């Protein structure tokens, strides 16, 4: 059986001696078939919420920093960001090597460097990265060039909708 939404729902239907669905009647289900579809998504959500950093949710983001802009939003699908993986990528044009950014707490940033966001004279190659409470990253000092920032994060799981949707969870799980 195919490892997609339709296949998983039909696994439930076969185990309970129900009629299997097809791709043509999958979208218009009612009753037990709708329950089976909900059960598949519920099981996937349960697995995804059990652990924050499943390997199949791992992703890498590259973001071009904007000159004099210290704040950057999380990716829309980010559950957690590995703050120890944030780095500036080597770029010979900008004359910069790979630089691992030091993690700083938001409270420490506010105590020591809060004025830096308003003082546009304080620019350079970022040396610190700060996670804010509102799902943003702050680069300190604010960039003076269009550096490439790279970091790793873990995605939020997603519900399956159409018959051919494939779960992000590997089949062996």
Regions found by a protein language model. Name each.
Residues 1-173:
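Glycine-enriched, solvent-exposed interface loops adjoining structured elements
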């Amino acid at each position: 059986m195919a490892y997609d939404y339709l296949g998983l729902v039909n696994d439930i239907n076969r185990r309970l001696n129900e009629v299997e669905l097809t791709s043509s009647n999958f979208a218009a289900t009612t009753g037990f078939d709708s329950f089976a579809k909900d059960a598949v998504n519920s099981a996937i959500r349960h697995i995804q919420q059990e652990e924050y950093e499943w390997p199949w949710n791992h992703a890498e983001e590259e973001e071009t920093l904007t000159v004099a802009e210290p704040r950057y939003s999380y990716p829309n699908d980010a559950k957690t960001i590995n703050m120890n993986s944030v780095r500036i990528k080597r770029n010979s044009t900008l004359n910069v090597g790979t630089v691992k950014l030091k993690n700083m707490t938001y409270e420490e940033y506010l105590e020591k460097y809060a004025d830096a966001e308003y003082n546009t004279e304080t620019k350079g190659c970022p040396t610190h990265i700060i996670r804010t409470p509102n799902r943003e990253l702050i680069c300190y000092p604010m960039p003076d060039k269009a550096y490439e920032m790279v970091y790793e994060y873990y995605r939020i799981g997603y519900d399956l909708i159409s018959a051919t949707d494939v779960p992000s969870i590997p089949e062996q799980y």
